[in-house]
Curated annotation (Swiss-Prot):
Protein name: Cellulose synthase A catalytic subunit 4 [UDP-forming]
Positions with a binding annotation for Zn(2+) 1: C23, C26, C50, C53
One Gene Ontology molecular-function label: identical protein binding
One Gene Ontology cellular component annotation held by this UniProt entry: plasma membrane
Biased composition (Acidic residues): 84-96
Residue ranges the record marks as coiled coil: 389-416
Binding-site positions, Zn(2+) 2: C42, C45, C65, C68
Taxonomic source organism: Arabidopsis thaliana
Phenotype when the gene is knocked out: Enhanced resistance to the pathogens Ralstonia solanacearum and Plectosphaerella cucumerina.
Residue ranges, annotated region (Disordered): 76-98
Tissue: Confined to secondary cell wall developing tissues such as xylems and interfascicular regions. Expressed in roots, hypocotyls, leaves, inflorescences and flowers.
Reaction equation(s) it catalyzes: [(1->4)-beta-D-glucosyl](n) + UDP-alpha-D-glucose = [(1->4)-beta-D-glucosyl](n+1) + UDP + H(+)
Gene that specifies this protein: CESA4
InterPro entries for this protein: Cellulose_synth (IPR005150), CES_Znf_RING (IPR027934), Nucleotide-diphossugar_trans (IPR029044), Znf_RING/FYVE/PHD (IPR013083)
Length: 1049
C-alpha cells in the first residue's frame, strides 16, 4: 500500500473511530496527547484505547492491541519495557525515573484488566477455591466495600491506601519520600480511580478438571447409545414383537430428549460482580448519581388466591431496596380491578414511611417484614447501634398492627355488597364489574407524595388497572405486562425494568445493583436484553418431595445456557433492557477494515479490500447524514394542541431529551433509499408499531430513557390512562413483535425467544445471597396444576408460528440455544412414550413375555455400559454444579410423576385447542400466606383432581404385575427366577419413581382417601378379570391335551 494512501486511510479511520473518544477497555474518555492530537494506541486498526490502559497493557498485559493483536509500539513519554526497539523514538528515560500519578487519571493502575464483549478480562488473576479473585500481587478484587472512604475508619482507610502505594513503589511507578497532605489526597483519589476503572464483572469458567471429564463422558455415552440401538434394532423379541417395537420407539425418543437437554449444558460458566467498583464509577462524592433508573413491575390478578399481605411484603421490599430512591419506581398491576388491593396499597404506602428508614438505618435483610421477623436467626449479630433492639421491637409491633389492618380488609372483602363496593369518598368503585371497567391509575409516594418519617423522599408507587370491555381480548398476564410497559414509559421511562411476581420479594437489597454491573457495562450492556436471576423459594419441606425448588434447572441448565447466548426468561426475577422489549435489534459491533501486510503488493490490497473502500465511505457518509438529521430534529420542539397530548406537557430541551417532531422526520427522509426510510420510519409507521400516543412514541426515541425536565407528573396521567385503554393495541405490533408476546400462557418463553432470535444476549446472575425469594405450591394437586399450565404453554408454542423447530432459521439464534428452546416446547410430548414405557413392565409380568430376548455375555456389555455412562454423567454433573444428589433424585422422580399426569393432560388439551378451538381456563396458582401453627399443612392436604388418575393406575398396575410375576415363578418352579429378575427390576423402577406421589395420596394419616380407594377397587376389578384370563396359578402344560389324546387313542 502506498504511503499517501495509508495516511489518508488512517486519518479517515481515526476520525470515524474517535468521534466519541471513548476507551473500549475502561469506558473513559480518550484524552489528547502532548501535541494536542487524539491519542492513538494502535496505528494498525486505530482501536480506541486511552493512554493509561495502553501503558498498563504494555507493562502487565500481553503487550498487544485487544482487537488486532498487533504488538504495541512505544510512544513518547511512555515507560520502556523489555523488548522495545532501540530506535523507537527519542530517549526520554530520564523523565520515566520519577513518574508521579496525575489527578486526571492518565496513570496506570495495579490491577486493571481490559475487557471484551464476552467478559473475558485479560488480567493477572487467579481463581481461589473460596470464590474470590486475587491478583498476582495479592490485592483483593472481589471484596465488597462502600464506594468511598465513608465505609472505613480512618485507620482502615490509611492501611488500605498504604498497601496500594507499597505495591506501586515496588513496581517503581511512584517515588518514595515524604508526601504532603495534598499528595496523600491525590494518592487516595488515584486509588479510587484505579479501582473504578476495573471491570464491573468477570466470567469464571468451570475448572477444566471438572468440565473436561464431563464432556468426555457425554461423548462416550453418545457412542454407547449408537451401539445400544444397533443391538436393540437388530435383535427383536420375536415372541413379544409389539412390546419390543413400542419399547424401542420409546427409548429412541428418550435418547433424543436427552440430547436436547444435555448439549445446551456443554459450556457452563459462573459470573461474579464487583459492586464496589459500580459505586465508585457511578456514585462519586460531589457529583450527580449516574446509576440508571429502574421501573419495577409487580403483577397480580386475584387477591383471594394471592393474599394481599404477601403482595404488600413484596412492595415493601422494593421500596426499601438499596438504590437511589429517585431512580426507583414501583408499578403494581391489578388485573382483577380489586378494591381490596387498592386499599392494601394505601395502607402499604403509609407503613412504608416507617419501614423504609428502619431498613436503611440498620441495614437489615431481607427487607420484607413478614420474612424478616419470622427468621429464626440471631438478629443481633453484627449490630452495634444501641437503639436497634428498641427500634426493632417498636417496628415489629407496628408491623403486627399493619397486618391486622390488612386482615380486616380481607375479611371485609369476603362478602361483596349487592350495590357494589363504595370508596371512602362515597363514590362507587369503578371496578365493580371486573370484566367491564375503565382504566385506573393512582400514584402514591414519590417526589410529589408523602415523605418518610425522617423527611426523606420515597420511591414512587403506582397502582395500575387497565381498562377491560366485552369483546376485547386482554391476553392475561402478557397484556397486563405490556400495559405497565406503556404506563411506565409515559410516567418515568426508566431504561431498565425489573419484573416480579406478587409473591416474589427482594431478598437481597443489592439485587438491582448486581444487574447494573452487567447492564451498565460499556461493552456488554449494549447487547443485553435482560439479566435473569434464579428463583429461590420459602416454605418448602426439607425433603422437597415434589421438586419445588427446581434446583437442577436453575443451577445446571441455566448456567449452561449462560455460556452460549444466555438463559431463558422464566417469568420473574428478570431485569430488562427497554429497547430490547420494543423490538429493536442490538447494536452491531464495529469491525475494523481488513488490511494486508506491507510486504504484499498494492494490487492485492485493491483486490482484497480496496474495492470496498468507496462503498464503505459512502455508507459512512450516509450514516453521518442520518445522524445529522437526527441531531437537527433533536433541536426542534413544536407545541401541539391535539386532544391526545397534554396541554401542560413541557418540551424543554435537556441532556436526556430526544423528542422528535414526527412530521419533520417524514419530510427529512427525502433523498434516502427505502432501507434508510424504514430505519427512521414515518409517523404512520410509528403509530402502527407503538400505537396512537405521541408521548409514548417520543419516549421510545430517548436513548437513555427519562422524561424532559420540568414535566408535571400529574399532567401525564391522562396520557397514561390512554395507553392502557382496551382498544389501544388494535392494529399495532404489541404482543406480536414488541413487548410480551401473545399466543401462549407461558408468555415468558415466547418473549425471551423472540429477543434471542434478534441477536440479543442475556446473562445469568447468581449472587451469593439469593436476589429474590418466592412461594411455591407444596401441595401435590396444586403442584401438578402448576406444571400443567407450564406444559400447556409449551404445547401452544409448539403448534404456533413461533415454534423453535422452524422459526427464524438463518437468523442470529445460536444452534445450542435453539436446542434448548426446542427442548422447552417438546418435553410435554415425552409423556406419551413415558406412559407407555411405565406400563410395559406390568404387561410383561402379566403375560410372561419380555421386550428383550435372551442375550449372551457380549450383548450384555452394552446394557452395562449404558447404565454406567448414565451414572457417570450424573456424578460428574453434580461435581461441577454443586447440586446435591437428593435434588437430582427428586428431580428425576417428579419428571416421571409430572410426565404421566400433567404433561399428558397438557398434550391433549393443547390438541383440543388447536384442532377444535376448545380453550382452557387459566388457573392462578394459590399463594398461601405462612401459618406458624402448621408450616407444612398444605403438604399433607389432599385435593382430588383428574390428574391423579394416570399415576394411581400405573402404581396399582405394576404392583399387581409384581404379585402376578412372583406367583407365576413360584407356581412354575425356581427355574423361572432368572428371566423374572429383569421384569421385576423394571417394575420396581416405575414404583420407586412414583413413590412421592404415593406418599402424597396417603396424606398425614397414612391412609388412602376414600375416592382413591374407590378408583383402586374399580381398577383392581378390571385387573382381576385379566388375571383370570391369564390363569397364572395353573401349571403350564407342555404336552398334548388330555381330551384330544383320549379321542385319538
Amino acid at each position: 500500500m502506498e504511503p499517501n494512501t495509508m495516511a489518508s486511510f488512517d486519518d479517515e479511520h481515526r476520525h470515524s473511530s474517535f468521534s466519541a473518544k471513548i476507551c473500549k477497555v475502561c469506558g473513559d474518555e480518550v484524552k489528547d496527547d502532548d501535541n494536542g492530537q487524539t491519542f492513538v494506541a494502535c496505528h494498525v486498526c486505530v482501536y480506541p484505547v486511552c493512554k493509561p490502559c495502553y501503558e498498563y497493557e504494555r507493562s502487565n498485559g500481553n503487550k498487544c492491541c485487544p482487537q488486532c493483536n498487533t504488538l504495541y509500539k512505544r510512544h513518547k513519554g511512555s515507560p520502556k519495557i523489555a523488548g522495545d526497539e532501540e530506535n523507537n523514538g527519542p530517549d526520554d528515560s530520564d523523565d520515566e525515573l520519577n513518574i508521579k500519578y496525575r489527578q486526571d487519571g492518565s496513570s496506570i493502575h495495579q490491577n486493571f484488566a481490559y475487557g471484551s464483549e464476552n467478559g473475558d478480562y485479560n488480567s493477572k488473576q487467579q481463581w481461589r477455591p473460596n470464590g474470590r479473585a486475587f491478583s498476582s500481587t495479592g490485592s483483593v478484587l472481589g471484596k465488597d466495600f462502600e464506594a468511598e472512604r465513608d465505609g472505613y475508619t480512618d485507620a482502615e482507610w490509611k492501611e488500605r491506601v498504604d498497601k496500594w502505594k507499597a505495591r506501586q513503589e515496588k513496581r517503581g511507578l511512584v517515588t518514595k519520600g515524604e508526601q504532603t497532605n495534598e499528595d496523600k489526597e491525590d494518592d487516595e483519589e488515584e486509588y479510587l480511580d484505579a479501582e473504578a476503572r476495573q471491570p464491573l464483572w468477570r466470567k469464571v469458567p468451570i475448572s477444566s478438571s471438572k468440565i473436561s471429564p464431563y464432556r468426555i463422558v457425554i461423548v462416550l455415552r453418545l457412542v454407547i447409545l449408537v451401539f445400544f440401538f444397533r443391538f436393540r434394532i437388530l435383535t427383536p423379541a420375536k415372541d413379544a414383537y409389539p412390546l419390543w417395537l413400542i419399547s424401542v420407539i420409546c427409548e429412541i425418543w428418550f435418547a433424543l430428549s436427552w440430547i436436547l437437554d444435555q448439549f445446551p449444558k456443554w459450556f457452563p460458566i459462573n459470573r461474579e460482580t464487583y459492586l464496589d467498583r459500580l459505586s465508585m464509577r457511578f456514585e462519586r462524592d460531589g457529583e450527580k448519581n449516574k446509576l440508571a433508573p429502574v421501573d419495577v413491575f409487580v403483577s397480580t390478578v386475584d387477591p383471594l388466591k394471592e393474599p394481599p399481605i404477601i403482595t404488600a411484603n413484596t412492595i415493601l421490599s422494593i421500596l426499601a431496596v438499596d438504590y437511589p430512591v429517585n431512580k426507583v419506581s414501583c408499578y403494581v398491576s391489578d388485573d382483577g380491578a380489586s378494591m381490596l388491593l387498592f386499599d392494601t396499597l394505601s395502607e402499604t404506602s403509609e407503613f412504608a414511611r416507617r419501614w423504609v428508614p428502619f431498613c436503611k438505618k440498620y441495614n437489615v435483610e431481607p427487607r420484607a417484614p413478614e420474612f424478616y421477623f419470622s427468621e429464626k436467626i440471631d438478629y443481633l449479630k453484627d449490630k452495634v447501634q444501641t437503639t436497634f433492639v428498641k427500634d426493632r421491637r417498636a417496628m415489629k409491633r407496628e408491623y403486627e398492627e399493619f397486618k391486622v389492618r390488612i386482615n380486616a380488609l380481607v375479611a371485609k372483602a369476603q362478602k361483596k355488597p349487592e350495590e357494589g363496593w363504595v370508596m371512602q369518598d362515597g363514590t362507587p368503585w369503578p371496578g365493580n364489574n371486573t370484566r367491564d371497567h375503565p382504566g385506573m391509575i393512582q400514584v402514591y409516594l414519590g417526589k410529589e407524595g408523602a415523605f418518610d418519617i425522617d423527611g426523606n423522599e420515597l420511591p414512587r408507587l403506582v397502582y395500575v388497572s387497565r381498562e377491560k370491555r366485552p369483546g376485547y381480548a386482554h391476553h392475561k398476564k402478557a397484556g397486563a405486562m405490556n400495559a405497565m410497559v406503556r404506563v411506565s414509559a409515559v410516567l418515568t421511562n426508566a431504561p431498565f425494568m425489573l419484573n416480579l411476581d406478587c409473591d416474589h420479594y427482594i431478598n437481597n437489597s443489592k439485587a438491582i445493583r448486581e444487574s447494573m454491573c452487567f447492564l451498565m457495562d460499556p461493552q456488554l450492556g449494549k447487547k443485553l436484553c435482560y439479566v435473569q436471576f434464579p428463583q429461590r423459594f420459602d416454605g418448602i419441606d426439607l425433603n422437597d418431595r415434589y421438586a419445588n425448588r427446581n434446583i437442577v434447572f436453575f443451577d445446571i441448565n441455566m448456567r449452561g445456557l449462560d455460556g452460549i447466548q444466555g438463559p431463558v426468561y422464566v417469568g420473574t426475577g428478570c431485569v430488562f433492557n427497554r429497547p430490547a422489549l420494543y423490538g429493536y435489534e442490538p447494536p452491531v459491533s464495529e469491525k475494523r477494515k481488513k488490511m494486508t501486510c506491507d510486504c504484499w503488493p498494492s494490487w492485492i490490497c485493491c483486490c482484497c479490500g480496496g474495492g470496498n473502500r468507496n462503498h464503505k465511505s459512502d455508507s459512512s457518509k450516509k450514516k453521518s447524514g442520518i445522524k445529522s438529521l437526527f441531531s437537527k430534529l433533536k433541536k426542534k420542539t413544536k407545541k401541539k394542541s391535539d386532544d391526545k397530548t397534554m396541554s401542560s406537557y413541557s418540551r424543554k430541551r435537556s441532556s436526556t431529551e430526544a423528542i422528535f417532531d414526527l412530521e419533520d422526520i417524514e419530510e427529512g427522509l427525502e433523498g434516502y433509499d427505502e432501507l434508510e426510510k424504514s430505519s427512521l420510519m414515518s409517523q404512520k409507521n410509528f403509530e402502527k408499531r407503538f400505537g396512537m400516543s405521541p408521548v409514548f412514541i417520543a419516549s421510545t426515541l430517548m436513548e437513555n430513557g427519562g422524561l424532559p425536565e420540568a414535566t408535571n407528573t400529574s399532567s401525564l396521567i391522562k396520557e397514561a390512562i390512554h395507553v392502557i385503554s382496551c382498544g389501544y393495541e388494535e392494529k399495532t405490533e404489541w404482543g406480536k413483535e414488541i413487548g410480551w408476546i401473545y399466543g401462549s400462557v407461558t408468555e415468558d418463553i415466547l418473549t425471551g425467544f423472540r429477543m434471542h432470535c434478534r441477536g440479543w444476549k442475556s446473562v445469568y446472575c447468581m449472587p451469593k445471597r439469593p436476589a429474590f425469594k418466592g412461594s411455591a405450591p407444596i401441595n401435590l394437586s396444586d403442584r401438578l396444576h402448576q406444571v400443567l399450565r407450564w406444559a400447556l404453554g409449551s404445547v401452544e408454542i409448539f403448534f404456533s408460528r413461533h415454534c423453535p423447530l422452524w422459526y427464524a432459521w438463518g437468523g442470529k439464534l445460536k444452534i445450542l440455544e435453539r436446542l434448548a428452546y426446542i427442548n422447552t416446547i417438546v418435553y410435554p410430548f415425552t409423556s406419551i412414550p413415558l406412559l407407555a414405557y411405565c406400563t410395559i413392565p406390568a404387561v410383561c409380568l402379566l403375560t410372561g413375555k419380555f421386550i428383550i430376548p435372551t442375550i449372551n455375555n457380549f450383548a450384555s456389555i452394552w446394557f452395562l455400559a449404558l447404565f454406567l455412562s448414565i451414572i457417570a454423567t450424573a456424578i460428574l454433573e453434580l461435581r461441577w454444579s454443586g447440586v446435591s444428589i437428593n435434588d437430582l433424585w427428586r428431580n428425576e422422580q417428579f419428571w416421571v410423576i409430572g410426565g404421566v399426569s400433567a404433561h399428558l393432560f397438557a398434550v391433549f388439551q393443547g390438541l383440543l385447542k388447536v384442532l377444535f378451538g376448545v380453550d382452557t381456563n387459566f388457573t392462578v396458582t394459590s399463594k398461601g400466606a405462612s401459618d406458624e401453627a402448621d408450616e407444612f399443612g398444605d403438604l399433607y392436604l389432599f385435593k382430588w383432581t383428574t390428574l391423579l388418575i394416570p399415576p394411581t393406575t400405573l402404581i396399582i398396575l405394576n404392583m399387581v404385575g409384581v404379585v402376578a410375576g412372583v406367583s407365576d415363578a413360584i407356581n412354575n418352579g425356581y427355574g423361572s427366577w432368572g428371566p423374572l429378575f429383569g421384569k421385576l427390576f423394571f417394575a420396581f423402577w416405575v414404583i420407586v419413581h412414583l413413590y412421592p406421589f404415593l406418599k402424597g395420596l396417603m396424606g398425614r394419616q397414612n391412609r388412602t382417601p376414600t375416592i382413591v380407594v374407590l378408583w383402586s377397587i374399580l381398577l383392581a376389578s378390571i385387573f382381576s378379570l385379566v388375571w383370570v384370563r391369564i390363569d397364572p396359578f395353573l401349571p403350564k402344560q407342555t404336552g398334548p391335551l388330555l381330551k384330544q389324546c383320549g379321542v385319538d387313542c
